[in-house]
Amino acid sequence: MENAKIKNMYDLSQSIAGEYLSQFTYPWEALKGISDFIKKLGPTLDPEIYEKRGENIWVAKSATVAPTACLNGPLIIDEDAEIRHCAFIRGSAIIGKGSVVGNSTEIKNDIIFNTVQVPHYNYVGDSILGYKSHMGAGSITSNVKSDKTLVVVKDSRDSGEEIETGLKKFGAMLG
């Protein structure tokens, strides 16, 4: 399933998680390790650029975080990102350079590449949003199937191939 491979979907130079993602074939393979990756990377970040704002939370000094935003770690907010009023970051999240997490948006277990817009009233869980992705207002990446079975990715553009992800929670892959 060539279309769904990380190397074909994402410009890895556009995320602080590029090296981490490069070890996987498919994006969903990276979801389980986001938390551990952040905990490992965070302490190595340049203290001239990032400040530690709590347990396993690193925020670039150039980022803007509204005082009403709720930040839970592990979390990295990269340079010039904007976290708006009442945004709720539940942890295991990387917010890329120049990205926007808007008001009343909830983020959980995600890699958000640089210059991504998740402007307002969104839920993004167990997802990877590629460089310059934009989710419209009120978008939800529902991350659990209604029948609670494992998620299977189907390639309708090629051979109709199916790959079982081994995951019960999987939101979206936006390239």
Identify the function of each model-found stretch.
Residues S15, E51-R53, V65, I89, ...:
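A generic, residue-level signal for flexible/boundary positions that often mark functional hotspots
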Residues G42, A69-L174:
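Flexible, glycine/small-residue-enriched loop-and-beta-strand segment within the central core
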Residues M1-N56, K61:
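Terminal amphipathic alpha-helical/low-complexity segments used for targeting or macromolecular assembly
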